[in-house]
UniProtKB/Swiss-Prot annotation:
Cofactor(s) demanded: FMN
Active site annotation, chain numbering: 343 (proton donor)
Positions annotated to bind FMN: 253-255, 311, 383, 413, 464-466, 488-489
Family: Belongs to the Dus family. Dus3 subfamily.
Species classification: Eukaryota, Fungi, Dikarya, Ascomycota, Saccharomycotina
Region (Disordered), start-end ranges: 47-88
Protein known as: tRNA-dihydrouridine(47) synthase [NAD(P)(+)]
Cellular component, GO, one term: cytoplasm
Zn finger spans (C3H1-type): 88-122, 135-160
Assigned EC number: 1.3.1.89, 1.3.1.-
Annotated signal sequence range: none
Source superkingdom: Eukaryota
PROSITE patterns associated with the record: UPF0034 (PS01136), ZF_C3H1 (PS50103)
Keyword presence, Protease: no
Length: 622
């Protein structure tokens, strides 16, 4: 595909004043009620009382991004102090005791008598709960279970003599099925400040010493000369990897629910571009294991034609610069480093990161410029909101960053930080920003022919907000003039959304098909977190987090009107079969019941508390 942007030549006078869903507006005129998902009469269930209609606010991107909402009624709101830490085995085996020599004897422990872990394998096996019935999903797929004797499906890959089985044929066939960006050996140098970040130190000095542009010409020339001297040998923006986001199917970075197993599922369902969960730059450069885990990806996310991006946010330019260097050098296969200028979390905002960068355009420009200096051939992109308050500032910020010529793509979420989800995303403003970028990027490209400090390919514009159907996606591209649409909630509630976009039709997935998605998520989760007791509990927890979104899907076959709207609320309904009703339950105990189909019975050690004290959209079982 050509790097040249395909811009529809539409006369300004031919454009509507506002972007509207004409089909939806026509249905409203014919009797459809705004804000209500009308259910066909045969699927309605009588309510026990009028009070049952009260429901807390629907799910929103802020929750997916780890954000907070203003206080709600006491009966609703969030369980902010919920405990999600899963307990591990009561008896912990020494890793050496689980590794065997060729003669079948266990490896000797380097700690000897001082080791605090168990070495008696039989004692450990007797302490384990009864094996889960069936075949280990990891062994079934890959031919080998990394958890070995700790696996909850141990009997499925252990012979009569007690030895672990390996299916060499499957193992060889799945050699490319692996996770990337395990950087454990580099964490210690980062923690001890021994990792070489001299390139970043050099760039930071340059950024700190830069002279304001409105000074006299002599000083400006001096600045340019110093820039060239310090920057010699560094990869220029014009030499970086070229992004292609035109018409791509993009999944938004999502806190908690945007984990690696979920992204693998979305890759199977047609996603082209995925992102890791947002990482904080200071913990990255300090070598925090948990933060670096957010940069991991699966091999399927970086195959040809696919893109994986690492998203970071920073309150200081020096943190962003050092993190960009470390990420670009230690992570393989990444297509971009995305700077989050839209995160609404209060803790992040108060530090001057996330959406706070929207109001500090000079600082944001320095951050992007510095990150681009040290990120090698990895381009820098920016995700933002319309602004922090009622006055939108995104257009001004994009103009500033475009002038710098270091930003490969902008993603604009059509809401402000303060607005949150009180209103729909403002796609008219997104169009205004997109048009300004399209009109400017030709000039930027011409400038790049004379100055290799400027990117040489189009600066893409991606819209974000309220995309739930194929018509939402295509209307955004056609009328808002964005190059593509980043989907967040729509891909959580309805993971097959890109299949609908591709076929341009509403797809009525059965309960059986939706269960297959959960089964695949469970399999990917066990590969990622492990098939031992801890891994099973982690997989179950994140599958429940996933279902806290998917249960909000109202099957299109029971709706009176299509297209469905994400924020429309249905009345109490029942599905076309018992399982469909169960999958629509807002009771988290029903979600746990569904997980037992793939992960076995729930043990006493499992802990899960839903994000909400109560859940919206009650069904017959909820």
């Amino acid at each position: 595909m050509s790097d040249e942007p395909v811009v529809k030549k539409t006369k300004v006078e031919d454009l509507p004043d506002t972007i509207v869903d004409s089909v939806y507006e026509k249905q409203l005129a014919e009797g459809r009620v705004r804000g209500v998902a009308s259910i066909k009469p045969e699927y309605l269930v009588a309510r026990a009382s009028a009070d049952a209609r009260d429901a807390p606010p629907s799910v929103n991107d802020d929750l997916a991004e780890g954000g907070e909402k203003p206080e709600e009624k006491k009966k609703g709101g969030q369980n902010k102090n919920r405990s999600l830490k899963q307990r591990k085995d009561a008896i912990k085996m020494c890793s050496s005791a689980l590794q065997f020599k060729e003669d079948g004897s266990p490896q000797e422990c380097s700690y000897g008598d001082k080791c605090k872990f168990e070495h008696d394998l039989q004692k450990y096996l007797e302490s384990k709960p009864k094996d889960i019935e069936g075949v280990c999903p990891v062994f079934d797929l890959t031919g080998q279970c990394p958890q070995g004797y700790k696996c909850r499906w141990l009997s499925s890959h252990r012979d009569s003599e007690g030895k672990l089985l390996v299916d060499e044929e499957k193992k060889k066939a799945n050699a490319d099925n692996k996770e990337l960006n395990h950087v454990f050996k580099h964490l210690n140098p980062l923690q001890r400040k021994k990792y070489d970040l001299s390139k970043s130190d050099e760039a930071i000095k340059l950024i700190d010493a830069q002279i304001v542009r409105d000074e006299d010409d002599e000083q400006t020339k001096l600045e340019k000369k110093e820039t060239i001297e310090i920057d010699t040998g560094r990869i220029r923006p014009s030499e970086k990897k070229k992004l292609d986001l035109k018409g791509k199917y993009i999944v938004s970075p999502l806190t908690t629910v945007g984990n690696l197993p979920y992204r693998r599922l979305m890759k199977d369902l047609g996603a082209d571009v995925t992102y890791g969960e947002m990482a904080l730059t200071l913990p990255l450069i300090q070598g925090h294991k948990a933060e670096w885990a957010l940069t991991r990806c699966h091999s399927s996310e970086v195959t040809e034609g696919n893109h994986f991006g690492v998203q970071v946010t920073a309150p200081k330019h020096w943190q962003a610069i050092k993190a960009a260097q470390a990420v670009s050098e230690l992570c393989t296969g990444i297509s971009e480093i995305n700077l989050n200028c839209g995160c609404p979390i209060d803790l992040v905002y108060r530090q001057g990161a996330g959406s706070a960068l929207m109001d500090q355009q000079g600082k944001t420009a320095r951050i992007v410029r510095g990150m681009s200096m040290v990120s090698g051939d990895v381009p820098i992109t920016v995700k933002m909101r319309t602004g922090t308050g009622s006055t939108p500032t995104a257009k001004k910020l994009t103009a500033r960053l475009l002038a710098e010529g270091q930003t490969a793509a902008f993603t604009l979420h059509g809401r402000s930080r303060a607005q949150r989800y009180t209103k729909l995303a403002d796609w008219n403003y997104i169009r205004e920003v997109a048009d300004s970028v399209v009109n400017t990027r030709d000039d930027v490209r011409e400038k790049s022919e004379l100055d290799d400090h400027v990117i040489s390919h189009p600066t893409w514009v991606v819209g974000n907000g309220d995309c739930y159907t194929w018509s939402d996606w295509h209307r955004a591209v056609d009328e808002a003039h964005v190059d593509s649409v980043m989907v967040a909630r729509g891909a959580l509630i309805k993971p097959w959304i890109f299949e609908e976009v591709e076929s341009r039709q509403h797809i009525d997935k059965s309960a059986t098909e939706r269960l297959e998605y959960f089964q695949k998520f469970a399999q990917y989760g066990l590969e990622h977190w492990g098939s031992d007791q801890y891994g099973v509990n982690q997989t179950r927890r994140y599958l429940c987090e996933f279902m806290s979104f998917t249960h909000r899907y109202v099957p299109s076959g029971i709706l009176e009107y299509l297209p469905a709207k994400m924020n429309d609320r249905p009345d109490l309904w029942k599905g076309r079969d018992e399982m469909e009703t169960l999958l629509g339950s807002s009771d988290y105990r029903d979600w746990i019941k569904v997980t037992e189909r793939f992960l076995g019975p729930v043990g006493d050690e499992f802990e899960f508390t839903p994000k909400h004290k109560s859940n919206a959209y009650p069904t017959e079982s909820g």
